[in-house]
Each structure stands twice: as structure tokens, then as C-alpha cells.
């Protein structure tokens, strides 16, 4: 049943940049997305995320962005990505509630919110929803 859902939920093929400072979350999210058929780039901080996005933006269909990162906040990274490409699709991921800063980022045009921790089904549904 889970396999049927995965195939139905994801057409795969798109490329996603995952930005998170926790190595375990990066690796697990990368593997989950790859199992759904996506190509995945990863970045552990804001500078790395912006560098990867600038280099690969023509290939990147979606950015999954952690809201709380050391050095550069998710909000600042979101704004920087939008300066590079105003049409970039961004899915905000956070262990914090949608209230406060996340709500402000969504109001500025972020494409969705994914509460952490998330399951494969939730990830697949939310990614597909934003990509469609």
C-alpha cells in the first residue's frame, strides 16, 4: 500500500535543494526524496545554499528550507533566493510552529510549510503540492 502511494504521490524527476544545518536531517531527507524519484542537492548553511542555488538554479525546481540556521536565518536565505529568482518555489520546514517568523515568510510568498518531524507521506504530499 505504501509503495502504491509513493508512486502515485510523486512523478519524480524534478530537482530539489534541501537546506538544513543538521546532517542527519539532510541525509534522511535526501534519501527519502531520492526514493520518490527526485534529484537532490544539499546545503548545510545559508552561504552554501545560495552558492548551490546560483550555480544550479536552472535545474532546481524546489528548495526545502529549514527556518532556523546558524549564521543566516531561513528568512534571510528566502529573501536572497527570491532576489536571484523571484519565481523560486520554497517549502519552509521547521520544528517550530507556523506562527511568528514562519508566518511572515509565508506572507512574503513562500509556497508552503512542512512541520518537522515529518513522515515520508507528508513530505511526498507537500513536495508534490508545491511542484504542481
Regions found by a protein language model. Give the residues of each.
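Disordered, acidic interdomain junction associated with two-component signaling
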Residues: 1-17, 54, 104
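Alpha4 helix (beta4-alpha4-beta5 surface) of REC/receiver domains from two-component response regulators
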Residues: 2, 75-76, 83, 87, ...
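The feature encodes the CheY-like receiver
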Residues: 26, 70, 98
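Acidic, metal-coordinating helix/loop segments flanking the phosphotransfer/catalytic sites
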Residues: 30, 42-62
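Residue-level signal for the "D+5" position in two-component response regulator receiver
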Residues: 42, 69-72, 83
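Acidic catalytic/metal-coordinating carboxylates
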Residues: 45-48, 73-77
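Active-site residues of response regulator receiver
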Residues: 66
Amino acid at each position: 500500500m505504501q509503495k502504491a502511494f509513493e508512486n502515485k504521490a510523486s512523478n519524480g524527476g524534478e530537482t530539489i535543494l534541501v537546506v538544513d544545518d543538521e546532517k542527519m536531517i539532510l541525509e534522511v531527507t535526501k534519501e527519502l526524496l531520492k526514493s520518490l524519484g527526485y534529484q537532490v542537492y544539499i546545503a548545510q548553511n545559508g552561504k552554501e545554499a545560495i552558492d548551490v542555488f546560483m550555480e544550479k538554479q536552472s535545474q532546481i525546481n524546489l528548495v526545502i528550507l529549514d527556518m532556523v540556521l546558524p549564521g543566516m536565518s531561513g528568512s534571510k536565505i528566502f529573501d536572497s533566493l527570491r532576489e536571484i529568482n523571484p519565481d523560486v518555489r520554497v517549502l519552509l520546514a521547521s520544528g517550530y510552529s507556523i506562527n511568528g517568523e514562519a508566518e511572515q515568510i509565508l506572507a512574503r510568498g513562500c509556497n508552503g510549510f512542512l512541520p518537522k518531524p515529518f513522515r515520508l507521506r507528508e513530505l511526498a504530499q507537500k513536495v508534490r503540492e508545491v511542484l504542481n
